[in-house]
């Protein structure tokens, strides 16, 4: 369904088994003053089938020939285990009568259809599109600057963390560590991970370097999350961490050391919660003690007053 307030459209594909090169279409939706729909299809690349998503302008034949609209769109394939594992791709494109659709590929279809991955649950796949109109100008002419600008996100944050495409200088500076291409800034922590836990990625069969880089980022995020102060962990954070660990284990990663840390953090969190409860109980008891003490003093005073000699009665006797 479409939401014109936040410019989002959610597409739930039911009875999803796989997609073919022939696209399937979402319902039409209205955002930014125009009707759109989403196309999902498969595309073969490097011997693998990838899921591709396109945003397509509907009824553009009725628009003026000089019509242009620059649009930024992001597609998110929702992970039902944890939002942090959701996959997102973003692009910017100048739509016109001739260029009515644009999109990109997200990840291997085999990973999408793997029931252990968290993307396919009860035969359903959920896709969220967010569309922002950046410019509308009939005098605007298409240029290379407004061809597609691809930006990929790795999904490791409650709000997805942007992972910008590497430029040539970045790629030239990449360092290979145990088959993972990492930036020099990541080298220290990656080396420490594999030195202390050499079994971590021995059974990871994925050869695609982009996917391997995203998996390393998942591990980074888990470390950052689990090594925070005990009081900084929310129940939601720990649930996400548990889902992320289960996902990584299904991919072949040996992360017993992180699972152990997660168990420790969960135990500490339970103790923190117990301490909070005990402090509240103590506070309530102290308040009750104060109230009872005041009531006791009042009762004693009333008894004392009631027991005092009645002079008028004594005079009579």
Swiss-Prot record:
Domain MATH: 6-131
Record protein name field: MATH domain and coiled-coil domain-containing protein At3g58240
Cross-referenced PROSITE patterns: MATH (PS50144)
Transmembrane segments: none
One Pfam family from the record: MATH_2
Top-rank taxon: Eukaryota
Keyword annotations from UniProtKB, A to Z: Coiled coil
Residue ranges of coiled coil: 254-305
Family matches, as SUPFAM superfamilies: TRAF domain-like
């Amino acid at each position: 369904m479409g939401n014109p307030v936040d410019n989002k459209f959610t597409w739930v594909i039911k009875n999803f088994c796989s997609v073919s090169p022939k696209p399937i279409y979402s319902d039409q939706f209205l955002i930014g003053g125009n009707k759109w729909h989403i196309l999902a299809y498969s595309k073969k690349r490097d011997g693998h089938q990838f899921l591709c998503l396109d945003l397509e302008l509907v009824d553009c034949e009725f628009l003026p020939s000089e019509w242009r609209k620059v649009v930024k769109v992001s597609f998110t394939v929702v992970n039902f285990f944890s939002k942090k594992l959701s996959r997102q791709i973003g692009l910017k494109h100048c739509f016109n009568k001739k260029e009515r659709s644009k999109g990109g590929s997200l990840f291997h279809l085999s990973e999408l259809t793997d029931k252990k991955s968290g993307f396919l649950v009860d035969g359903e796949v959920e896709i969220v599109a967010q569309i922002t109109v950046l410019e509308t100008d009939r005098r605007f002419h298409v240029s290379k600057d407004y061809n597609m600008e691809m930006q990929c996100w790795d999904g490791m944050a409650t709000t997805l963390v942007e992972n910008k495409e590497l430029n040539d200088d970045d790629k030239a500076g990449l360092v290979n560590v145990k088959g993972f291409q990492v930036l020099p800034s990541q080298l220290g922590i990656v080396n420490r991970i594999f030195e202390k836990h050499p079994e971590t990625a021995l059974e990871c069969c994925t050869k695609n370097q982009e996917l391997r880089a995203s998996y390393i980022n998942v591990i980074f995020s888990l470390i950052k999350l689990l090594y925070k102060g005990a009081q900084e962990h929310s129940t939601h954070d720990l649930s996400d961490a548990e889902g992320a660990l289960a996902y990584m284990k299904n991919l072949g990663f040996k992360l017993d050391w992180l699972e152990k840390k997660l168990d420790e953090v969960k135990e500490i969190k339970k103790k923190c919660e117990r301490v909070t409860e005990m402090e509240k109980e103590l506070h309530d008891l102290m308040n009750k003690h104060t109230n009872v003490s005041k009531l006791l003093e009042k009762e004693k005073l009333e008894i004392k007053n009631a027991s005092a000699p009645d002079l008028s009665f004594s005079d009579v006797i």
